[in-house]
């Protein structure tokens, strides 16, 4: 999908509020028909970026293009984008039909065309049975679809969504997440979706843009972001439980390259050149996900296991199908994930294996991935 020509082009976008940088030098292409998620913690700049695309905030610097037209000087109504707010902004006293028709009537569209377009959108979003109901009497799913339909009916080229599922209870959020993704696939519209919820971004987005303190940390597919985080921030932000981090020192012993933390060490001969080139100080942060630390008694894929390491079990948190286990080794407390059926208790000693093929390496000075 991302091979399609870009429909949105952001070039060196910057936004300051009273001298505080909210968005710094953001450049991005969004492909036609793509579902891209802007992900990051509160205050990272993701909503500000969305509002600049919509025309609700004026960039301090940079350009915004929609296809071959530069739109950042234009008012919101002339940009060809639709914005779906977190609170839906419906007219509660009006019917679903009148909510859908409102934008067209304001634009002076003829009654016949208004009716045709409203009914077309209502059918595509399965709203036909509730068109005459007041918005205040709709269930949350229908409210979501009316808010989306009200934007679709004016035929925007791009849909911008600012945390539209934020007010839903967890179970309903999962249902609506799937419904929204299905709608996007069936309509084929380009969507830019802002969320602080990594599960939403990783399950819905064709690509995910991760932001932190106004800067883009990484733009990639969900799979690549999880498997190959580009920065220390992305590595720690993506994944639950979070990645374990261990400060190490690069050493060469008998011609072999190692990363060492006290008595712990990992041979990294295949990554030696990258470490020497990208971490000249010799200091390296090793990251390993909890699921890549395994009890030695459980099967580990051949050729990927590391050395067996005795640890002390500090805490066991049982979940539905797995357990999160805190283990102590030397001065470290690491998290690991085991199957829910695996018997383990706090206080016992356990032999574990850290999968050396799953180590992530970071330069503590640049905070970027090595290799």
Task: Give names to the regions the model predicted.
Residues 54:
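Helix-to-loop junction immediately C-terminal to a conserved catalytic motif
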Residues 227, 256-258, 262-314, 342-371:
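Glycine/charge-rich catalytic "coupling/switch" loops of P-loop NTPases
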Residues 62-70:
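Conserved ABC transporter NBD signature motif
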Residues 9, 29, 65, 351-353:
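ABC ATPase nucleotide-binding domain
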Residues 47-50, 146:
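ABC ATPase nucleotide-binding domain helices that frame the ATP-binding cleft
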Residues 76-82, 86, 90-233:
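ABC ATPase nucleotide-binding domains
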Residues 39-41:
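The feature captures the beta-strand-to-loop junction immediately N-terminal to the Walker
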């Amino acid at each position: 999908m991302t091979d399609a020509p870009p429909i949105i082009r952001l070039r060196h976008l910057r936004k300051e509020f009273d001298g505080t940088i909210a968005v710094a030098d953001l450049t991005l292409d969004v492909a036609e028909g793509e579902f891209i998620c802007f992900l990051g913690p509160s205050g990272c700049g993701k909503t500000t970026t969305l509002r600049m695309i919509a025309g609700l905030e004026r960039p301090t610097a940079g350009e915004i293009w929609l296809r071959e037209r530069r739109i950042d000087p234009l008012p919101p109504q002339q940009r060809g984008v639709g914005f779906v707010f977190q609170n839906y902004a419906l007219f509660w006293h009006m019917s679903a039909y009148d909510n859908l028709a409102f934008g067209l009537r304001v634009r002076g569209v003829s009654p016949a065309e208004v009716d045709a377009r409203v009914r077309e959108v209502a059918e595509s979003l399965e709203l036909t049975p509730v068109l005459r109901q007041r918005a205040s009497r709709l269930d949350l799913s229908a409210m979501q679809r009316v808010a989306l339909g009200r934007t679709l009916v004016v035929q925007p080229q791009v849909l911008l969504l600012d945390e539209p599922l934020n007010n839903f209870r967890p179970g309903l959020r999962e249902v609506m997440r799937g419904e929204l993704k299905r709608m996007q696939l069936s309509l084929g519209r380009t969507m830019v979706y802002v969320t602080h919820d990594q599960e939403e971004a990783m399950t819905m987005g064709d690509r995910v843009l991760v932001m932190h303190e106004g800067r883009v940390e990484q733009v990639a597919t969900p799979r690549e972001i999880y498997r190959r985080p580009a920065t220390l921030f992305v590595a720690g932000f993506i994944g639950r439980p979070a990645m374990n981090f261990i400060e190490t020192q690069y050493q060469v012993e008998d011609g072999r390259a190692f990363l060492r933390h006290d008595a712990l060490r990992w041979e990294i001969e295949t990554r030696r050149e990258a470490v020497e080139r990208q971490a000249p100080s010799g200091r390296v942060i090793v990251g390993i996900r909890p699921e890549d630390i395994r009890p030695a008694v459980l099967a580990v894929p051949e050729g990927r296991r590391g050395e067996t390491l005795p640890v002390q079990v500090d805490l066991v948190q049982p979940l539905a199908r797995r357990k999160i286990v805190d283990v102590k080794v030397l001065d470290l407390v690491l998290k690991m994930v085991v199957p829910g059926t695996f018997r383990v208790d706090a206080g016992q000693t356990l032999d574990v294996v850290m999968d050396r093929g799953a180590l992530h390496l970071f330069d503590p000075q640049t905070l970027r991935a090595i290799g």
